[in-house]
């Protein structure tokens, strides 16, 4: 090779190396923003046919509901592009505020900050005929849970049965809570999203109190991108779900219903013990009881009600417990959540050591069971879908 060709070759190599270095640097400075146009997902071949069990075990009698009021459509794209949120200085000087625990002070000081930019978005998930949207709350570090869900109950289907559309799955995430880990995990998440194309991510920290942000961000996203999806299942990333039973339950439901069904807690009292995860000081909620709400392990709702919820939630101040906050939004609408025995937020049996919590025949009869580790979920899924012989289905446990 001549000298000028060698020089040209070295120059080209150096330019490529610099381009790669600049790209990596930009990704580390603005995590998530570099993936504006992700590659198409590489999902396995979709299953076809009906998921609905021919038996009508989960078809229950339902209350007559009033027609759903028309809800005005909001913006047609996610319209929050910058994070411009400052502390509420007026609040910080109040004596009652200064007496609160640090995490409550943090929550209240930024309570007015409701919406944040999107880092990862997949509006195409609602394109075409979608019957059920499966939405899973997750955190950036829980890749193993998301992977097991994709292999089991979160697997997408092209048909939910005769005359019914597809089943699509999405995961809801914020950003890593630890600053020193954020860039690393964001790059891993970007790769995961390139593989599967099923992650919605917003630019707020994933924390317990920010679960409420995740609720309102999803409701806003749904209102923008999914105006016609009939039903939504929303759950945690540590639950067992039986999609066949979910679809059987929905088979005689109408999208226009104000449907919100799960493991409903009524007359629950605010916890005042400071060492409890769900402790709420009286200054933040002074009433004796919460409105009825569904435990966050998982619940079903109609798309029409979800769009109403988006607007109802915008009329309320944010509350640090997301399940209770949704109950407050339902109360604004005058809608009462419906309890169902197939949703087990606290396990099939509340006694942790009970053998029922490991019995696959019970899981075959349920809709949602909370909670399982990834290995437990995978093992139970295989058992439930094996040549298992169960004497009967259990309606009330």
UniProtKB/Swiss-Prot annotation:
Spans within the Lumenal topological domain: 27-397
CC per GO annotation: Golgi membrane
MF term (GO), any: UDP-glycosyltransferase activity
Gene3D superfamilies named among the record's database cross-references: 3.90.550.50
Cytoplasmic topological intervals: 1-6
Location(s), subcellular: Golgi apparatus membrane
Residues annotated as transmembrane: 7-26
Biological pathway: Protein modification; protein glycosylation
Enzyme class per UniProt: transferase
Disulfides per UniProt: none
Main subcellular localisation: Golgi
Keyword ATP-binding applies: no
Pfam families cross-referenced by the UniProt entry: Galactosyl_T (PF01762)
Keyword Thylakoid (UniProt): no
Sugar attachment sites: 84, 90, 210, 387
Role summary: N-acetyl glucosamine (GlcNAc) transferase that catalyzes the transfer of GlcNAc via a beta1->3 linkage from UDP-GlcNAc to the non-reducing terminal galactose (Gal) in the linearly growing chain of N- and O-linked keratan sulfate proteoglycans. Cooperates with B4GALT4 galactosyltransferase and CHST6 and CHST1 sulfotransferases to construct and elongate mono- and disulfated disaccharide units [->3Galbeta1->4(6-sulfoGlcNAcbeta)1->] and [->3(6-sulfoGalbeta)1->4(6-sulfoGlcNAcbeta)1->] within keratan sulfate polymer.
PANTHER family in UniProt: BETA-1,3-N-ACETYLGLUCOSAMINYLTRANSFERASE (PTHR11214), UDP-GLCNAC:BETAGAL BETA-1,3-N-ACETYLGLUCOSAMINYLTRANSFERASE 7 (PTHR11214:SF93)
UniProt similarity note: Belongs to the glycosyltransferase 31 family.
Identification of the protein by name: UDP-GlcNAc:betaGal beta-1,3-N-acetylglucosaminyltransferase 7
